């Protein structure tokens, strides 16, 4: 049968190689510490320098000042069910990378010049680069999820893929309701 989210969060199978990189006093009660851990983890993803026109927009997008609400909620939710919530960090990072991928494509669809008070990737590098960098971010999100052990990976990938499709469906419904500028 399918494993439920609480079961995924509290199982020892969720242990990843990243658990050892957290301080022993890591607390899910301290939102600033969680946010700092998320920022640190995102900074450690390590995109190559070349080709620069592919990876620079990804780094630019991920370093814009966002609230990191999605990964924060994922970490807090997993913390309810587990005494090792840091095991959820690869999934939290994948959700944030995926979210930023959707923003790159959304800016293209909206013809948006600005994102979070900065020039959008679309405005700064152009449509083709924004599409390709966004696509690389989507693939990178799946690569982050691949860090999980094979015992839980199929369930995690299935849930993530369902979420990704639902986000795309939501964007399409949004376009159907509110015509975009051409």
Task: Indicate where each model-derived feature is located.
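Polybasic, lysine-rich low-complexity intrinsically disordered segments
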Residues: 2-3, 13-14
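N-terminal amphipathic/basic leader segments beginning at the initiator methionine
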Residues: 18-45
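Mg2+-dependent prenyl diphosphate-binding active-site environment of isoprenoid biosynthetic enzymes
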Residues: 43, 47-182
């Amino acid at each position: 049968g399918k494993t439920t989210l609480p079961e995924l969060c509290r199982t020892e199978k969720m242990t990843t190689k990243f658990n050892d990189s957290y301080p022993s006093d890591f607390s899910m009660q301290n939102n600033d510490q969680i946010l700092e851990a998320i920022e640190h983890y995102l900074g450690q993803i390590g995109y190559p320098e070349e080709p620069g026109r592919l990876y620079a927009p990804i780094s630019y997008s991920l370093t814009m000042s966002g609230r990191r609400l999605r990964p924060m909620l994922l970490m807090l939710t997993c913390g309810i069910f587990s005494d090792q919530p840091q095991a959820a960090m690869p999934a939290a990072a994948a959700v944030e990378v995926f979210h930023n991928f959707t923003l790159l494509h959304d800016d293209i669809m909206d013809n948006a010049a600005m994102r979070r008070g900065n020039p959008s990737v679309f405005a700064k590098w152009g449509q083709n680069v924004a599409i390709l960098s966004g696509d690389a971010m989507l693939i990178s999100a799946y690569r982050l999820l691949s860090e999980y052990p094979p015992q839980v990976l199929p369930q995690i990938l299935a849930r993530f893929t369902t979420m990704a499709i639902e986000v795309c469906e939501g964007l399409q419904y949004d376009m159907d309701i509110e015509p975009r500028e051409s």
